[in-house]
Amino acid sequence: MNLRDKLDVYLRLARMDRPIGTLLLLWPCLMALLLAAGGMPDLKVLTIFIFGVVVMRACGCIINDYADRDLDAHVDRTKSRPLASGEVTGREALILFAVMGLFAFGLVLMLNPLVVKLSVVGIILTIIYPFTKRFTNMPQMFLGVVWSWSIPMAYAAQTGEVPAEAWWLFAANWCWTVAYDTMYAMVDREDDLKVGIKSTAILFGKYDRQIIGLFQLAALACFITAGWAADRGLVYGLGIITFVGFSMYQQKLIHERERAPCFKAFLNNNWAGLSLFIALGVDYLI
């Protein structure tokens, strides 16, 4: 394998060819920076967090695939991943994870000590998450914490503290993550049952759609409260209404629990997050 082919494999291992995860991480992080800064985040902080989201999402994908390398080969959707297919060795994956993790930590060192401390917790959570699928039926709930951790970090970077209002956005994103990652887990439910991977899609069973709906409602309530705490106005409210519309569309897609529509519902959450972020940004502008 030549250098160009090897680089392509590493990029696929880091999921650089599939940006959906990065985008789902990015929108709430940017919202946190906007709210923490009153609409005008520091350019240095903004740049560091954008790069940090990209790199840490890649780290999460690498360590996830390393943990699942023996299981992914038995799942249709994941059997072609570089580790599962043998294109990359476990040692190579760990080295790449370490290099990218150190790069991300280097970015954080340019910020204040509180952010550095929170980042250490974040990397530990990132490493633990893939293994939660072995011993709990609720890995999506743990993932919700991991994927929301940039929110208190963003507040800490911008203000030097993590105020109470930050946790409303954290709670909103946690509920939203559980909802959309359960949709994602519905795609693999049959394969996961065969190989012993646990998920909320399996745990919720025939009540999956209803429970996803409850998490969507809880996310909505917390997003509203976060906006209220920051004294947001009409445009943010329109963003909330748009978010509701996307959530209803996702419920329609997962109604029959078929793989392709469930995956489409998962992907649709990118537009839900983007619309809410844009609404928040415009609300500050006017």
Swiss-Prot record:
UniProt entry keywords in alphabetical sequence: Cell inner membrane, Cell membrane, Magnesium, Membrane, Transferase, Transmembrane, Transmembrane helix, Ubiquinone biosynthesis
Principal cellular location given in the protein's record: membrane
UniProt keyword annotation of Transmembrane helix present: yes
Classification via InterPro entries: HB_polyprenyltransferase-like, Prenyltransferase, UbiA_prenyltransferase, UbiA_prenylTrfase_CS, UbiA_sf
Protein topology in the membrane: Multi-pass membrane protein
EC number per UniProt: 2.5.1.39
Record GO cellular component, one term: plasma membrane
Reactions catalysed, as given in the entry: all-trans-octaprenyl diphosphate + 4-hydroxybenzoate = 4-hydroxy-3-(all-trans-octaprenyl)benzoate + diphosphate
Transmembrane region(s): 20-40, 43-63, 95-115, 142-162, 167-187, 210-230, 234-254
Compartments, as annotated in UniProt: Cell inner membrane
Gene3D superfamilies: UbiA prenyltransferase
Example of a GO biological process term: ubiquinone biosynthetic process
A GO molecular function held by the record: 4-hydroxybenzoate polyprenyltransferase activity
Cofactors required: Mg(2+)
Pathway info: Cofactor biosynthesis; ubiquinone biosynthesis
Stated family: Belongs to the UbiA prenyltransferase family.
NCBIfam families for this protein: ubiA_proteo
Function of the protein: Catalyzes the prenylation of para-hydroxybenzoate (PHB) with an all-trans polyprenyl group. Mediates the second step in the final reaction sequence of ubiquinone-8 (UQ-8) biosynthesis, which is the condensation of the polyisoprenoid side chain with PHB, generating the first membrane-bound Q intermediate 3-octaprenyl-4-hydroxybenzoate.
Protein name: 4-hydroxybenzoate octaprenyltransferase
Gene that this polypeptide is encoded by: ubiA
